[in-house]
């Protein structure tokens, strides 16, 4: 919104803005904020906060951190009562003035600079497609004496026998793709979200009900450069959740909220450009792909087992990545084939539209780190001319066992991908984009705060299985 500090001050005064919402991203990927009066905001000044209270940041004995405004990200918040402008900030060390190596937005900024320094290209475009579910309610409890979750949705397949306010038109399990209303209960909600996205500067291309029951949805908007695309995704999630909340609903981007139905993924479309020219198109190549694009895919497929530590970084991610629910578990590439982890969309002969789509990711993690890791893996493939295995255009779910045995698969758990990241992360250190400290912190955080607590707790299904042993 703002190009410089003077422009920011003028607009804040002219538009009678009351508050500035200071936003930055924690290490796991959740946006944080604090709010200051607009009258106290000086775009040129740093603001301080306690880094020891932010997940994945500082220890208590070195907790002071500072943020500096990225004025290009300023947006009026449509959900606040008093006029508020949200601005994303970069994090700095207040003593040295250096950019903080664990600041996810700084990682994305360094990734873009590294791309330009390689001479391969000057711009990377990323287009995530984040699916989500819409529920009426969610209840959960975890204590020493109880553990459960309960979700409900007026459109849920499990509510066909509900006694009250049941007018039918429930969405069957794995049967939600493209039905018209009244089976599609949430067309108006998605339309309202789409209008808010457009007002926020995200150009919506389409919205639809996805395959899952209970309001699973997808809203696609225009791609962007790496850092901006990650900012856009955080803004997208903020708008989706708040519009749902305003309508008495609750939205979740959890990868697998419903057992027995499709999970929610985040397919990521990617392309490289230089001097305004697309680098991924060659009409003579398979599916119209250039050598550069093929090597880029080769890098991602080679490093995928460690990449998933950033693109699929939760325990719940691996409940989605199982055969039978349209999940891309096969580490191969193909034209059109949605059972492959890497797909080349049909885009005709337009070089500018040629891109590759990595289908494994979900949106439970940190988009700044995920997109940066994907770019670095792809660039490693280009620099080292990593050839992917031959494309497979068959339905990979229907291969004979002997054929399927030769197809590489994604790892099946978060501990497995963290082990792979520990062994394979040199490509992430290029250009000092990721630091060894960041990678070590990420692995330790996931093991300590997400894996270990689950290992300590009995699961409700264990009672069903083992109570009467």
From Swiss-Prot:
<keyword id="KW-0436">Ligase</keyword>
<feature type="binding site">
    <location>
        <position position="271"/>
    </location>
    <ligand>
        <name>ATP</name>
    </ligand>
</feature>
<protein>
    <recommendedName>
        <fullName>Glutamine synthetase</fullName>
        <ecNumber>6.3.1.2</ecNumber>
    </recommendedName>
</protein>
<dbReference type="InterPro" id="IPR001637">
    <property type="entry name" value="Gln_synth_I_adenylation_site"/>
</dbReference>
<dbReference type="Pfam" id="PF03951">
    <property type="entry name" value="Gln-synt_N"/>
</dbReference>
<feature type="binding site">
    <location>
        <begin position="262"/>
        <end position="263"/>
    </location>
    <ligand>
        <name>L-glutamate</name>
    </ligand>
</feature>
<dbReference type="InterPro" id="IPR027302">
    <property type="entry name" value="Gln_synth_N_conserv_site"/>
</dbReference>
<feature type="binding site">
    <location>
        <position position="320"/>
    </location>
    <ligand>
        <name>L-glutamate</name>
    </ligand>
</feature>
<dbReference type="InterPro" id="IPR027303">
    <property type="entry name" value="Gln_synth_gly_rich_site"/>
</dbReference>
<feature type="domain" description="GS catalytic">
    <location>
        <begin position="104"/>
        <end position="469"/>
    </location>
</feature>
<feature type="binding site">
    <location>
        <begin position="269"/>
        <end position="271"/>
    </location>
    <ligand>
        <name>ATP</name>
    </ligand>
</feature>
<feature type="binding site">
    <location>
        <position position="326"/>
    </location>
    <ligand>
        <name>L-glutamate</name>
    </ligand>
</feature>
<dbReference type="GO" id="GO:0005737">
    <property type="term" value="C:cytoplasm"/>
</dbReference>
<dbReference type="InterPro" id="IPR014746">
    <property type="entry name" value="Gln_synth/guanido_kin_cat_dom"/>
</dbReference>
<feature type="binding site">
    <location>
        <position position="352"/>
    </location>
    <ligand>
        <name>ATP</name>
    </ligand>
</feature>
<feature type="binding site">
    <location>
        <position position="338"/>
    </location>
    <ligand>
        <name>L-glutamate</name>
    </ligand>
</feature>
<feature type="binding site">
    <location>
        <position position="131"/>
    </location>
    <ligand>
        <name>Mg(2+) 2</name>
    </ligand>
</feature>
<feature type="binding site">
    <location>
        <position position="205"/>
    </location>
    <ligand>
        <name>ATP</name>
    </ligand>
</feature>
<keyword id="KW-0963">Cytoplasm</keyword>
<feature type="binding site">
    <location>
        <position position="263"/>
    </location>
    <ligand>
        <name>L-glutamate</name>
    </ligand>
</feature>
<dbReference type="Pfam" id="PF00120">
    <property type="entry name" value="Gln-synt_C"/>
</dbReference>
<feature type="binding site">
    <location>
        <position position="359"/>
    </location>
    <ligand>
        <name>L-glutamate</name>
    </ligand>
</feature>
<dbReference type="GO" id="GO:0006542">
    <property type="term" value="P:glutamine biosynthetic process"/>
</dbReference>
<dbReference type="GO" id="GO:0019740">
    <property type="term" value="P:nitrogen utilization"/>
</dbReference>
<feature type="binding site">
    <location>
        <position position="129"/>
    </location>
    <ligand>
        <name>Mg(2+) 1</name>
    </ligand>
</feature>
<keyword id="KW-0479">Metal-binding</keyword>
<feature type="binding site">
    <location>
        <position position="343"/>
    </location>
    <ligand>
        <name>ATP</name>
    </ligand>
</feature>
<feature type="binding site">
    <location>
        <position position="210"/>
    </location>
    <ligand>
        <name>Mg(2+) 2</name>
    </ligand>
</feature>
<keyword id="KW-0547">Nucleotide-binding</keyword>
<keyword id="KW-0597">Phosphoprotein</keyword>
<keyword id="KW-0460">Magnesium</keyword>
<comment type="subunit">
    <text>Oligomer of 12 subunits arranged in the form of two hexagons.</text>
</comment>
<feature type="binding site">
    <location>
        <begin position="221"/>
        <end position="223"/>
    </location>
    <ligand>
        <name>ATP</name>
    </ligand>
</feature>
<comment type="function">
    <text>Catalyzes the ATP-dependent biosynthesis of glutamine from glutamate and ammonia.</text>
</comment>
<comment type="similarity">
    <text>Belongs to the glutamine synthetase family.</text>
</comment>
<dbReference type="GO" id="GO:0004356">
    <property type="term" value="F:glutamine synthetase activity"/>
</dbReference>
<feature type="binding site">
    <location>
        <position position="357"/>
    </location>
    <ligand>
        <name>Mg(2+) 1</name>
    </ligand>
</feature>
<dbReference type="InterPro" id="IPR008147">
    <property type="entry name" value="Gln_synt_N"/>
</dbReference>
<feature type="modified residue" description="O-AMP-tyrosine">
    <location>
        <position position="397"/>
    </location>
</feature>
<dbReference type="GO" id="GO:0005524">
    <property type="term" value="F:ATP binding"/>
</dbReference>
<feature type="binding site">
    <location>
        <position position="267"/>
    </location>
    <ligand>
        <name>Mg(2+) 1</name>
    </ligand>
</feature>
<dbReference type="GO" id="GO:0046872">
    <property type="term" value="F:metal ion binding"/>
</dbReference>
């Amino acid at each position: 919104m703002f190009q410089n500090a003077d422009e920011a001050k003028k607009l804040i005064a002219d538009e009678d803005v009351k508050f500035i919402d200071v936003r930055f991203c924690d290490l796991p990927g959740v946006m944080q904020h604090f709010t200051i009066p607009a009258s106290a905001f000086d775009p040129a000044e740093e603001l301080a906060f306690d880094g020891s209270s932010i997940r994945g940041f500082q220890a208590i004995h070195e907790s002071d951190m500072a943020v500096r405004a990225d004025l290009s990200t300023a947006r009026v918040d449509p959900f606040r009562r008093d006029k508020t402008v949200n601005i994303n900030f970069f994090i700095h060390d207040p003593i040295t003035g250096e950019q903080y190596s664990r600041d996810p937005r700084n990682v994305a900024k360094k990734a873009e600079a590294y791309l330009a320094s390689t001479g391969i290209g000057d711009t990377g475009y990323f287009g995530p497609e984040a699916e989500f579910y819409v529920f009426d309610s969610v209840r959960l409890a975890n204590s020493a004496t109880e553990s459960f979750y309960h979700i409900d949705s007026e459109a849920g397949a499990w509510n066909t026998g509900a006694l009250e306010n049941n007018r039918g038109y429930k969405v069957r399990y794995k049967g939600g793709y493209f039905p018209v209303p009244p089976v599609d209960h949430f067309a108006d909600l998605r339309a309202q979200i789409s209008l808010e996205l457009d007002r926020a500067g995200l150009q919506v291309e389409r919205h639809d009900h996805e395959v899952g029951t209970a309001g699973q949805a997808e809203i696609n908007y225009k791609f962007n450069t790496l850092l901006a695309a990650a900012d856009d995704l955080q803004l997208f999630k903020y708008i989706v959740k708040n519009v749902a909340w305003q309508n008495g609903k609750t939205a979740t981007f959890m990868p697998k909220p419903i057992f027995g139905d499709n999970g929610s993924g985040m397919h990521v479309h990617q392309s490289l450009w230089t001097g305004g020219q697309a680098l991924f198109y060659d009409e003579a190549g398979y599916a119209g792909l250039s050598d550069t694009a093929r090597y880029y895919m080769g890098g991602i497929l080679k490093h995928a087992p460690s990449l998933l530590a950033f693109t699929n970084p939760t325990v719940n991610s691996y409940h989605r990545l199982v055969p039978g629910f349209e999940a891309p578990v096969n580490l191969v590439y193909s034209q059109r084939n949605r059972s492959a982890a890497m797909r080349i969309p049909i885009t005709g002969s337009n070089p500018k539209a040629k891109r590759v789509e990595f289908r494994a990711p979900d949106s439970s993690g940190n988009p700044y780190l995920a997109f940066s890791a994907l770019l670095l893996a792809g660039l490693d493939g280009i620099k080292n001319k990593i050839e992917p295995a031959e494309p497979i255009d068959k339905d990979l779910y229907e291969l004979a066992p002997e054929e399927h045995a030769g197809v590489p698969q994604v790892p099946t758990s978060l501990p497995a991908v963290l082990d792979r990241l520990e062994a394979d992360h040199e490509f992430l250190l290029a250009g000092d984009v990721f630091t060894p400290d960041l990678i070590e912190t990420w692995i330790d955080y996931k093991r300590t705060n997400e894996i270990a607590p689950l290992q300590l707790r009995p699961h409700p299904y264990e009672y069903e299985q083992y109570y009467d042993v």
